[in-house]
């Protein structure tokens, strides 16, 4: 997993990488990179009724960017994002939640997922309890 680190949600929107309109796993962290919340955005860009809809993380939080930035201001917290295969996004999210047990994830911390992989973390990455660096 090739992680990219951001300090503001607005920076994700302004990034050069397609504004994250693709399937990804994201981690909201403390200053030191410890996961607080792990999620996925697995919807690809699509066309519905002649209108093109954004996909991925941009669609997931489209109306909440400024609120999320306001909540994060001055905290030193970060957002880490890794592009993933849409078919594996849910399984990877479940595995990361189970292994790291982030404070703000309500589900998935006690039951092991049905499938798991050896995840290799690259780039500027969050502080994960498992996986290869």
What does each of the following model-derived ranges do?
Residues 1-36, 40-133:
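Boundary/linker segments flanking structured domains
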């Amino acid at each position: 997993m090739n992680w990219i680190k951001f300090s503001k949600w607005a920076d994700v929107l302004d990034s050069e990488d397609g504004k994250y309109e693709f399937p990804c796993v994201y981690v909201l962290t403390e200053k030191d990179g410890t996961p607080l919340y792990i999620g996925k955005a697995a919807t690809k860009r699509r066309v519905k009724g002649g209108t093109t809809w954004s996909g991925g993380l941009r669609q997931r939080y489209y109306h909440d960017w400024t609120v999320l930035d306001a909540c994060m201001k001055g905290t030193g917290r970060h957002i880490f994002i890794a592009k993933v295969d849409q078919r594996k996004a849910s399984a990877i999210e479940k595995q990361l939640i189970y292994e790291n047990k982030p404070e703000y994830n309500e589900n998935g911390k006690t039951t092991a997922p049905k499938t798991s992989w050896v995840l290799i973390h690259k780039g500027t990455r969050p502080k994960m309890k498992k996986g290869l660096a």
